[in-house]
Structure formats: structure tokens, C-alpha cells
Amino acid sequence: MADDGMLLNFALPSDVIKPQTKIKGGSWRERLSVKKIAARRATNPKRTADGDGNKDGNESGPRNPNRIQVSGSRPAKRQKTDGGFQKLGEGQAHGQGSGQSKGPKKGQGGSVVSSLFSKNPRPRNAVEEDKNDEPMEDAKPTNAPLIDGLDTFTNLGLSPTLAAHLLTKLELKAPTAIQKASITQLLKEETDAFIQAETGSGKTLAYLLPLVQRIMALSRAKNEGDAKGDTSVHRDSGLFAIILAPTRELCKQISVVLEGLLRCAHWIVAGTVIGGEKKKSEKARLRKGLNILVATPGRLADHLENTQALDVSNVRWLVLDEGDRLMELGFEKELQEIISKLDARQRPSRIPGVPAKRATILCSATLKMNVQKLGEISLKDAVHIKADPADEDGEKTAEDKDGDAFRVPAQLKQSYAIVAAKLRLVTLTAFMKRTFMRKGSVMKAIIFVSCADSVNFHFEVFTRKLAEQLEGDNPDEGSDSEHEKEKEKEKPTPASTHGTVAPATAFSNSSNAVTMYKLHGSLPQHVRTSTLSSFAKNRDPSVLICTDVASRGLDLPNVDLVVEYDPAFSADEHLHRIGRTARLGRDGRALVFLLPGCEENYVEILKRGYRDGGKALTRSTTDDILKRGFGGNIESQKWQLELERWALDNPEYLEMARRAYQSHIRAYATHVANERHIFNIKELHLGHLAKSFALRDRPGKINVPGLRPGKEDTKKDFKAERKSAGGKKRKATGYGGGRDDDDDDDRPSATTDTTLAAQKMRAKMKEQLAGASEFNLA
């Protein structure tokens, strides 16, 4: 096309085409943030020029005549700290103290130092509970012994020898209600039985007394039938009774009670076989002969399979203590094997008076009447024995209405506290400080937590050396001699309890020294046994922090207080926890920690355990606990900050805190299904919860130390990878694997899809095992 000589001239304003600045570097989040700031400046240039717009700007309009204009170039104020000066945040620069800061501060390494008392959720029913200020009358104990007197035991059918032994040696003047009902029934008929009663009402003696009485009667029958009259039932006569319990600690306690009973019948021999002990020693005891055997299901099933010296042909009584717990812990397979082998090996006895068939007794405080799970334990025509006469008439109706109902001893004073996640640890410390403030007010207390890692962390927190103790570690010579004298006065702890017993510096004071114990299922068996024995025998103020391993059946003397720092995984387990106190008619107290929000609905479950509808259930406020324990919020904040600095200064304890935090979250997800709407893991504020473990890291930055494979695990994975890929095996040169590890890193061709899948599966199994090990109860 020919040039027509036309000239086009478009004139554009200069502000139409603006230079586009391309943002480079940084992460995509940072680039996006810069873009948003630039867009906001472009849309509102006046606000950005003034800094805060109408707040500090110089726009036209009425102004306060008393206002003094301050230059924006003035530096922020600084607060003097122990190490010098520290720049304050924006909120503190305007006059807010360190204890009243509204927002979190940045610490070292990107950690967050937040205030204890900011942004805490308020309880839903914060004002509803302060209604009943009238003092309540003390309730009549429901698990106390009946009328005193020697005739009460003899009237139940026990021999005068056994009744006199109970009165003189064991100092038991009268039976409890459940003992009266069970002894009468079990001595009268040879049938299977359910024994259900409150915690602390003497269920162990309820089945041991009829058992010992029956075997003592066999001794008399054999003496009468023997011409010489000089022989009786002895250890070679055979095994007559087996008692199964879910935990090793409960087996030990049953064995101690049984040995105390058998002192009046020395010819009857009892023994134990439990996990964690040497099989060789147990087999030696079985070869010598036993009449009564106390065992855990797993170890008994092992001996029935592999020990020929264990003769069960004469077993006529099988007791399942805490039978529902046996099923819950996964012992169903072992119980089926035990029952089938007992049935197959049963033979008619040549001893006169031995029953023709075996009787099975199942006892627990939270026994449910639906026997679908327990039907496989061969219970036939079982008799239900209950202590409360009010329940006998309406037994079916009560169970139909609420099959999960549980009962709390009437004399137990139970309370709950709605505590924000940030304040959990400092509130627990304040409560325990107040509890042991006066000597003699409380002798023993138990703190229940959810997992073993949490036990280890809190044990170190409560037994750590305080700042004033660290300063006094290097005094002059005179104070050194005094310190040595005080050490000489202290009782030495057994070697088997080192690491599980220490002075509780967080609770102790100058007039009342408190000893701290820890117990969980991951400890070696001899350590668990010696720690529990030391706590039971200690007559000074002491605290046991433990998992549910100590919640079932253990009769620990003089326990005045039970604190559920982490709520139980079910209402039944809650009953067993608080049942460690208020035993045999004695008074006791219990406190449950709950979080604001959906956990407040747990109060209705607590009220169901009371006969009066929960009128005796009281509430404790966080402010009151902190005021009584620390004197106020300022001291509480100081204690928390000191604890966080202690964790940062000690990498070992910081890792322990992280383990406890992660394990606590995993344990929180294991509540029973019908209570999961109350303990909803999605409602947890993970950042606030981390502060209760003395952590300043963000939840996403808290790594799980136990899930990373170690050097030996990595070495095994490499060997398995080479084997599955068909590579040649090479010998390892040392501990680190040396050349093998380095060569494998540079050979991607040896890794196949099958090998990668196997590695992922192994890592997943390690993760599951790491989470499950801390809930080990048996």
C-alpha cells in the first residue's frame, strides 16, 4: 500500500504509563506482602504519608488544643533488663508493663514471648456457679466398714481362726458392705459371680477371704479323711486358684494382701508371675509348688504354653480383678487361651472337698451389665453382687437407663477448675504450693497426666533447682559444713529409685519439705516396684506424678488429694483415678483441670457420679488459685518466665518439653468416642498449650525428636534397601557405617519404587510405635 503521507500523533498524559517495579527475592509470602503494601499506598497515599491517618496526621479539621505534637523520629523507649537494655514493643512503649502487654514479643531465634494473661478465652458459665455459699454437711461415708465386733466376720461364715487373724493382726474390725455381700454369697454357692462396688470399698478382700476360707476347709477335710491325721494341704497338693490382674502393680498389691492373710495358714503357699520378671526364677517357684497364683494374662499364657511344671488340673477358682480393664487393654486373646487350656486340662481331684467345676469371679468398680465382651470368658449363670441395697430392687431399671453410670464415694469432696491453656502449669504449681503450705494439712497427693513424656517433663520442672538454690551451691566453709550435716540426716534413697525420687522444690518451703515421685509404664519393672513401695511407705509429705498405671486397684495409704491435670480418657477411668483417695470411709479431695470451651460440658458427666445430682461438686477459679499460691499475677508471670528461660538454657530439658507437648496432643486424641465431642482436638489452641510446656516456639516449629531415625536405624534401612534391590552385601566398617553410607547416597539407581514404599511403611510404623509406647500400662 502506498504511503499517503498521513502522520498520526497520539498525545497521552504522563500519569497514564507508570513504571512497573518487579519485586524479586524472598519467599512468595514476603513478595505478596510487599505487593499488598504497595497497593494500599497507591489507593490511600494520604494515610501512608501521615503514618496512621487521622491518628497522627496533619489533615485539616478540628484538633485537640491540648495535644502536643511529637516528632516521628523519636526512638522507642527501652526497658532495662538483667542483661542490659531491651527494646520495648509498641504496646509497652505507651506505658504498658511487661506483665500487662497485649501482644506477644519476639524472643531469641524467632520464639514468641507472650503474656500469661492476654487473649485467654473466658469460661462460658463464668458467673453461674457462685450461688451456693452455704456450708454443706459432711456426707456419710458409703464405703466405710460396718458395725465393729468380732462376731461380724464369724457370722459371715469365716472360721474363728481367720476372723481372729483379721482383727488382731490386720486390724480389720468389721467388713464393708461389699465384703459382707460377697463373702455370704461365695461361701454359700459355687457359682460364677460379678462383684461391683465403689472404689476403696475392699473388693480385694471380698474375693480373697472366701478363697482362703475354702482352701483352709480343704485342709481340714483332708486331715479328717487321712488315717494318720498329720498331713494337710501343702504346696505340693496342686494349684487351686488363679487371680488375674491387668497391671503388674496391682498384682504386687494383691500378693501383699494375700501373704498377710496366709500368715494364719502357713501351709498354703501363694506366688506371682508377672511381666518384667525373670522367667527362670518364676519357673523355679512353679516347680516347688503353689496353691494360689497371682498373674498378669500375658505371662500366665506364656507359662501355660511353655512351662510343663505348671499343673492346672486342680484349678477350681479363677478371679478376674478389674475384668473390664483386662478386656479394654487387649487381653481378650490371652484370656481365651487361658480359659480354653484350663478347661482342657481340668481333671477330677483326689482331695476331698474340692468342687467338681471351676467358678469364675469377675470384679470391678465400673462393671457394665452388658456381658457381650465378657461372654467369651465362660461365665455361666453369674450372680450379680452389689453392695448398695437401694440398687437391688431397681437393678434392671437403673442399668437400662444408664449403662455407663458410675458412683463416687459420698465423702469424697470433688471440685473442678476451668483453666486457660496458657495458665495450666502455673495454676497447677500454685495449687500444689497452697496445698503443702502448712505442715500436716496434706500428707500425700497424686497427680495424673496423660502420657509418660509428660510425666518426665513435669517431674523435672517440679524438682529443678531454683535460682536461690543455685546461688547457694558455693557458700563459705561454715555453711558447707551445715549443708553436709543436713545431707547426713536425710535418708538415702534406694539405688533402684534413683531418677524417680527427688525433693519437690516447687512445692516445698522452709517448714514443710515435700518429696516427688514419678511412675509410668515405660520404666523398668524393678524401678516401678521400688518407687511405688517407697511412696507407700513414706510418712512425710510426698507427691506422685504418674499415668493411669497407678489408677487401678492400688491401695496407697494416706492419699488425701488426687489431681487430674489431664482429664481421664473415659468416665470409668476417672472413677478409678479419684478412687485412690477417700478409701474405707476416710475423707478425700479431688480436683479436675478443664479447658474453657467444649470441655466445660464434662461437668455434667462429673455430676452423674453423685447420688445427689452433683450438689457436692464445687468449682475453683483460676484467679483464686493463683492468688493463694503465688500472691497474684505478677509472681505467677515471674515464675513462668523463669521456667521458660530455664528450658531455653538447657537443651536437654527443652527437648523433653517438646516431647511432652507432642505426646500430650497425641494422647488428647485418644478419648473414648462418646466423649470426643467434649475433648475435641480441633478446639485446642496449640500455641497457648505450648506455653504450658514452657515452650516459646510456634507450634509449627516444634519438631518431634523421637520420630527422626537415628544412625543405627538409618544403617539398617540402607542394608534392607540394598538387599531388596538385589545389590551386593558389604560388611560395615564401624559404628557409623562409614563407606557403606556414603556409597549408598550416590547411587540413586539402586532405589526402586518397592524400596521407597517399604521405607515409607517402616517410617510410618516407627511413628505409630513411638506414639503408642508412652501409653504402656502393663
UniProtKB/Swiss-Prot annotation:
EC numbers listed for it are 3.6.4.13
Q: Which reaction does it catalyse?
A: ATP + H2O = ADP + phosphate + H(+)
Q: Which PROSITE patterns match?
A: HELICASE_ATP_BIND_1 (PS51192), HELICASE_CTER (PS51194), Q_MOTIF (PS51195)
- Polar residues composition bias: which ranges? 61-72
GO BP, sorted A to Z: endonucleolytic cleavage in ITS1 upstream of 5.8S rRNA from tricistronic rRNA transcript (SSU-rRNA, 5.8S rRNA, LSU-rRNA); ribosome biogenesis
As annotated in the record, motif Q motif runs over: 151-180
* Superkingdom assignment: Eukaryota
Reported function: ATP-binding RNA helicase involved in the biogenesis of 60S ribosomal subunits and is required for the normal formation of 25S and 5.8S rRNAs.
Q: What does the comment on domains in this protein's record state?
A: The Q motif is unique to and characteristic of the DEAD box family of RNA helicases and controls ATP binding and hydrolysis.
Question: What is this protein's record name?
Answer: ATP-dependent RNA helicase dbp7
Task: Provide the taxonomic classification.
Answer: Eukaryota, Fungi, Dikarya, Ascomycota, Pezizomycotina
